């Protein structure tokens, strides 16, 4: 039983290191990003394939809020280069607060809104099974 678990663990680790897929010759694909313009919800953005010269994904979020109201406008697109660095600009005018968040990234669909499963715990979640099997084999 222990040798079988060891083989299973080794195959899972090798799959993790290769990105979970077999290594084959695959033709190069263009970058894909989410695209939308001044929508109120990130769920209204849809994935598109960028042109060959577009190498980054850009997202802008404009947030206006008061003590009783909140309005967000989201825009996302492909771009040839980052228009500016990632930044957050905040200001206030009377009782209205405003924030513009600009982000630029270079991975496929990297400009999506983070879901509840993403962020800090996403990498440990992907490694949990191989690490758990490794610990199990060690205890045998």
Swiss-Prot record:
Q: Where in the cell is it found?
A: Cell membrane
Question: Which keywords, in A-to-Z order, does the entry hold?
Answer: Cell membrane, Disulfide bond, Glycoprotein, GPI-anchor, Lipoprotein, Membrane, Signal
- What is the protein's major site of localization? membrane
Name which cysteines form disulfide bonds: 33-50, 105-110
Q: What SUPFAM superfamilies does the annotation carry?
A: Snake toxin-like (SSF57302)
Q: Quick one: where's the GPI-anchor amidated serine lipidation?
A: 116
**Entry annotated with the keyword Disulfide bond:** yes
Q: Does the keyword Plastid apply?
A: no
GO-annotated cellular components:
plasma membrane; side of membrane
Q: How does it sit in the membrane?
A: Lipid-anchor; GPI-anchor
Family annotation (SMART domains): LU
Q: Which residues form the signal peptide?
A: 1-20
Q: Which residues form a coiled coil?
A: none
Q: Which residues form the propeptide?
A: 117-140
The UPAR/Ly6 domain covers: 31-124
Q: Which PANTHER family match?
A: LYMPHOCYTE ANTIGEN 6H, LYMPHOCYTE ANTIGEN 6L
Q: What is this protein called?
A: Lymphocyte antigen 6L
Q: Identify the species of origin.
A: Mus musculus
